[in-house]
Design a protein with these regions (language model features):
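Capsid-like jelly-roll
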Residues: 1-174
Length: 174
């Protein structure tokens, strides 16, 4: 959910809304650790790694309200392995960090991913091709929640300008 601040008369001064954002990510089939980063507290550009689009209806709200603050967000990710024979099992997980660079520096090997207390949960999946007899049949789903007040250690993210942004920018504190 996010809080919006109005810039036009005739509308409420602020409004809480829930917006939905969907992104499809394709990784190469290398043996290397691959990471992808999202901004948990931005609706202007949630996709840190690749850039992208805003959640549905964000542009319409941005015509009425000039600032936003993300109070909470949630991610649901489902790995969809390539359907072919000989696919090796893969590890899949998430990490919440104040720096997108932490992902690439901290998780340079699978062992770091599996041993980290900050990655939750490391899942293993394999080939989803039922006819090949290779790999695992079940796809795992990772869900995680972000609460801005808890994560940043503040009473309310609405109290600090570092967590609020113009509708044309990301917050200063990402």
């Amino acid at each position: 959910s996010m809080q919006l601040s109005a810039r036009m008369t005739g509308f409420p001064k602020s409004k809480r809304v829930k917006l939905k954002y969907v992104e499809e990510i394709v990784f190469s089939s290398s043996n290397l650790i691959q990471t992808y980063s999202f901004r948990t507290n931005s609706v202007f550009d949630p996709n840190y790694t690749g850039g992208g689009h805003q959640p549905m209806l964000f542009d319409q709200y941005a015509e009425i309200y000039n600032h936003y603050t993300v109070l909470a967000s949630m991610i649901t990710a489902t790995p969809a392995p390539i359907i072919s024979t000989g696919v090796v099992p893969s590890y899949f997980g998430w990490n919440l960090s104040t720096s997108a660079n932490a992902l690439t520096t901290d998780f340079s090997a699978v062992t770091y991913l599996l041993e980290s207390n900050y990655t939750n949960p490391p899942l293993i999946y394999g080939n989803n091709n039922a006819d090949s007899g290779v790999g695992l049949r079940t796809l795992n789903v990772v869900r995680a929640k972000f609460n801005a007040a808890d994560f940043f250690g503040v009473t309310s993210p609405l109290d600090g300008s570092a967590y609020t942004a113009l509708c044309t920018a990301n917050p200063a504190q990402e």
